[in-house]
Amino acid sequence: MHKAILNSDLIATKAGDVTVYNYDGETREYISTSNEYLAVGVGIPACSCLDAPGTHKAGYAICRSADFNSWEYVPDHRGETVYSTKTGESKEIKAPGDYPENTTTIAPLSPYDKWDGEKWVTDTEAQHSAAVDAAEAQRQSLIDAAMASISLIQLKLQAGRKLTQAETTRLNAVLDYIDAVTATDTSTAPDVIWPELPEA
């Protein structure tokens, strides 16, 4: 096999084989080495060059420089998870390069954590406010369940029917329970102690 002779534009002036180093068209990351036969007037394949990349270094990808004139080592964090310092959302890194801006490798400990520039700090006011909102929703759920448990008794009352002693006792117990649930202090959330629904 004859070796190809190329001009300054990397076009073959004499047909033959040439070793090229291929890279990804988007990330410019080194992919492989191949031997190509070039006929006269044919250039090297797209996304390839003639200069060999350096040896592999742990934690780095070998990529073509932005001007395509040389190889460079680019940090390779692929497979790592980073967290947005704005929202706390996680994202897996899928391309070579530095960590994206406004991210950290430190995971937030709660949905209420805010980044202070160095670490996550829990926004206790937001956390407490969310706990109070959840307690208020729990209050309404308990009241709804209690009301559902006496719906037949309410229907009898609306129809003007007389209640048995057991039904009257049950109705009063559930109404007392609803009063107790309504009076429960949710400002201590998430440590709210709810009253027990009376047995049917």
Swiss-Prot record:
InterPro entries: Phage_T4_Gp38_tail_assem, TFA_Chaperone. Pfam families: Caudo_TAP (PF02413). It comes from the Bacteria. Belongs to the tfa family. This is Prophage tail fiber assembly protein homolog TfaE. It comes from Escherichia coli (strain K12).
